[in-house]
Amino acid sequence: IRAFHGHLKEAKYVYVAKGSAIVAIVELDNVESPSKLQKVERFILSDKNPQILFIPPKYANGFRPLEVDTRIIFFSTSSLEESKGDDYRYPADYWGKRIWKVEDR
């Protein structure tokens, strides 16, 4: 699991090129101390059903690969230099552990 980090200005596009993954996003109401009551949205992205997920600014995101050798590509609207001062990180279980639970498929 790699989570959570967010940006106030930067948006991202996420694509799974190989395998599948849970991608979770949550709106940041306050970057210094976000509410743990914010609703987390989960998406299953897979190479079997190709989709691009848009993550707007003011959202935190994270992911959990569901298969060995899963390949995830993140596209950013900011350069690496621009995003350095716009990076906020939170523990993977900040909004609960159930986010990363894999239900029977």
State where each predicted segment sits.
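Conserved SET/PR-domain catalytic core that frames the SAM/AdoMet-binding pocket
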Residues: 48-63
